[in-house]
């Protein structure tokens, strides 16, 4: 299964909603990129990047429930990290309410919300969509 850029917003929103992740801020944007993989023409996994120069927000990681525990989430994150690094991103940030252990296993560490770069603080994910109780994490590439 190959991972590639995707831009079909309805398909992206459908998988995010099925995984109970926010969709209200998904719209065409130069700074928001999505990558995904399909199986039998069905989107089964996605990950997003909001890129702001040397920092980026890793977001919207979603895997079809029937495809979980098969390494797809890790593959999507690895792909997103490599793509971000190829664009000059030095630090990736993320917010999660349920997957902090998963991301810790991939090298992400807890980060201070107060010390978040202003570009990250200004994202809709940071400023409103994700609750204050979300784990805020960072990985330096």
Predicted regions located by residue number:
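Conserved active-site alpha-helix within GNAT-family acetyltransferase domains
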Residues: 97-123
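C-terminal "cap" of GNAT-fold acetyltransferases
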Residues: 116-141
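A generic "binding-loop/recognition-motif" signal
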Residues: 8, 54, 98-99
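Conserved GNAT acetyl-CoA-binding A-motif
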Residues: 82-98
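Conserved beta-strand in the GNAT
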Residues: 36, 42-50, 55-62
